[in-house]
């Protein structure tokens, strides 16, 4: 970590974790019983200066799993009609196989050893993702089983607001409320917000940290 070039590599920024921004739209709040209806996944990249940004986004409309509960209030809120054939929905398994493939490829390219979900109010998205993976009996998930980066918490600290739309606007990121509650739109705004916070922290001198030996040397000089 004493080498500034190493500190500008993604694999060193988050302890070997590759951040993957996710947003889901669902038919309720219960990941055990309610349908996952839409998911978007934004992959990130870091340039040679250590600035993190958006790489690409995957987006899937999802068929409700067999026996899934569909709460009318949730459908009215997100405007999704699960029966609409124009959605082009795929099964949970098909979507997650594609997501796993893309995430693992990007994770490997960044020389990271595991991926970590980034989301706004991350416990919600992480819960639905984890339950879908379990239902599909998919092995070797790239995602950490419980750790996440929650942009609601990060925004509360860095910007002073926890609502996604308000935090984005305060950070100078355009946000159209008419587009909100689309997994694709919300994921990319969440990704922009996460990148803004990480890059802002770096620009203020919060990263990279001094290595222990550098700190010791500096303390010795000052003494």
Curated annotation (Swiss-Prot):
Tell me which residues this entry annotates as catalytic: 181 (proton donor/acceptor)
Which gene is transcribed and translated to give this protein? rnt
Q: Which domain of life is it from?
A: Bacteria
- Extract one GO molecular function annotation from the record: magnesium ion binding
Chain sites annotated for binding Mg(2+) 2: 23, 25, 181, 186
Give residues annotated as binding Mg(2+) 1. 23
Q: What keywords would UniProt list here?
A: Exonuclease, Hydrolase, Magnesium, Metal-binding, Nuclease, tRNA processing
**Name of this chain's protein:** Ribonuclease T
Q: Which organism is it from?
A: Shewanella baltica (strain OS185)
Gene Ontology biological process terms, A to Z: DNA replication proofreading; tRNA processing
Q: What is the lineage of its organism?
A: Bacteria, Pseudomonadati, Pseudomonadota, Gammaproteobacteria, Alteromonadales
User: Member of which family?
Assistant: Belongs to the RNase T family.
Cited InterPro entries: Exonuclease_RNaseT/DNA_pol3 (IPR013520), RNase_T (IPR005987), RNaseH-like_sf (IPR012337), RNaseH_sf (IPR036397)
Q: What cellular component GO annotations does this protein have?
A: cytosol
- Give the EC number: 3.1.13.-
Ranges for domain Exonuclease come to 20-194
């Amino acid at each position: 970590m004493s080498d500034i070039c190493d500190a500008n590599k993604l694999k060193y920024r988050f302890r070997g974790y590759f951040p993957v921004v996710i947003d889901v739209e669902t038919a309720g709040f219960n990941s055990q019983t309610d349908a996952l209806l839409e998911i978007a996944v934004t992959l990130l990249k870091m340039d040679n200066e250590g600035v993190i940004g958006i790489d690409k986004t995957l987006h899937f409309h999802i068929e409700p799993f067999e026996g899934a509960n569909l709460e009318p209030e949730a459908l009215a809120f997100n405007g999704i009609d699960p029966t609409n054939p124009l959605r082009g929905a795929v099964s949970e398994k098909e979507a997650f196989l594609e997501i796993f493939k893309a995430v693992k490829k990007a994770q490997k390219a960044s020389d990271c050893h595991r991926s970590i979900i980034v989301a706004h109010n991350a416990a919600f998205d992480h819960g639905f993702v984890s339950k879908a993976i379990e239902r599909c009996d998919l092995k070797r998930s790239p995602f950490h089983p419980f750790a996440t980066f929650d942009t609601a918490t990060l925004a509360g600290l860095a910007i002073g607001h926890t609502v996604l739309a308000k935090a984005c606007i305060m950070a100078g990121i355009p946000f159209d409320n008419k587009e909100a509650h689309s997994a694709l739109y919300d994921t990319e705004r969440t990704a922009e917000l996460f990148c803004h916070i990480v890059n802002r922290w770096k620009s203020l001198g919060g990263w990279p940290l001094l290595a222990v030996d550098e700190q010791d040397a500096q303390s010795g000089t000052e003494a």
